[in-house]
Amino acid sequence: MNEKRTGLFENGLIWFGAGVSIAEILTGTYLAPLGMGKGLAAILIGHIIGCLMLFLAGVIGGRVRKSAMETVKMSFGQKGSILFAVLNVLQLVGWTAIMIYDGALAADGVMHTGRWIWCLVIGVLIILWIVIGITNLGKINTVAMAALFLLSLILSKVIFAGGGAGAPSDDSMTFGAAVELAVAMPLSWLPLISDYTREAKEPVKATAISAVVYGIVSCWMYVIGMGAAIITGEYDIAQIMLKAGLGIAGLLIIVFSTVTTTFLDAYSAGISSETVVSKWNGKHVAIVVTVIGTIAAIVYPMDNITDFLYLIGSVFAPMIAIQIADFFLYRRRYHAGFG
């Protein structure tokens, strides 16, 4: 394990990148039937709930200096931790495939060279990121996040300043279901956050910044997706990019944002695999996960990820709830980190 500790800015940067993704924007479009007012309320409520749990999960790993799945072992024992680690690896393979699929679909919408080609391009770039390693990506991530921030501003301007009559709300999505869908995104990161907060110089502050930054950016992406569907009637991120006049620049940022986000999924899958089989090399497993995700993205259509998100919430929300109670109410299980 590298002894170098990460600073507050670095942690904020990591979770800014996690929040800016095609998947967040696409999920936001699902909330369009609620209308802007109720949709915004659902997004905010869902993210407050989800990010509070994300913060508490990150504090646990940060204080005891253990990865997400290692902290699970403290509450559920060796066998329990292996079960959740296996589930985590499986869901991260799924997320890797979904992110590659969505990114490739959007990229192909801008430059029609074939979705499978973009799947391969994104997959190869993710592997390159894994080989470089998370400790050597500082300057690259800074440039990437600055570019993604500018892109998000442009998308927001195009969507909300471009006019349009807007689509009327309907009853195809209930408010409760929308809140659950908004909660699902932060929950999907619960089994990952400790993989990063454990390396922070100031784990509690770093976790707070991570959760707040992710929450704000994720809400922003949801609103972009929902706004595009309601105001412009456009659900296709590629078409939004083209209408914004971004062209090749939009294409590059679609690919880049997909790589920087999906890298976290693959990297944490590798870390989780070490809980299952201690002899495995996390970096090698991360590469295998990326290959599997790339193949799945090529051969399997993943246009609607709602059910997958609900499944994640049903598995990991109870897990972290027990961990939170165990850590904050029954601290005797966690002597490390309390001095």
Describe every region a protein language model picked out.
Residues 5, 170, 322-339:
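C-terminal membrane-solvent junction of multi-pass transporters and transport-like membrane proteins
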Residues 29-59, 73, 80-82, 214-216:
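Extracellular loop-to-transmembrane helix junctions
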Residues 1-38, 50, 136, 174-179, ...:
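Membrane-interface "cap" regions at the ends of multi-pass membrane proteins
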Residues 80-112, 258-275:
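Hydrophobic transmembrane alpha-helices that form the core helical bundles
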Residues 4-6, 132-142, 168, 188-216, ...:
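Hydrophobic, small-residue-rich membrane helices and short re-entrant helix-turn-helix hairpins
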Residues 29-33, 59, 98, 102-110, ...:
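Membrane-water interface regions at transmembrane-helix termini and the short interhelical loops
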Residues 14-18, 84-89, 110-133, 145-156, ...:
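Transmembrane alpha-helical segments of multi-pass small-molecule transport proteins
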Residues 30-41, 105-119, 135-144, 237-249, ...:
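Transmembrane helix-loop boundary segments of multi-pass membrane transporters
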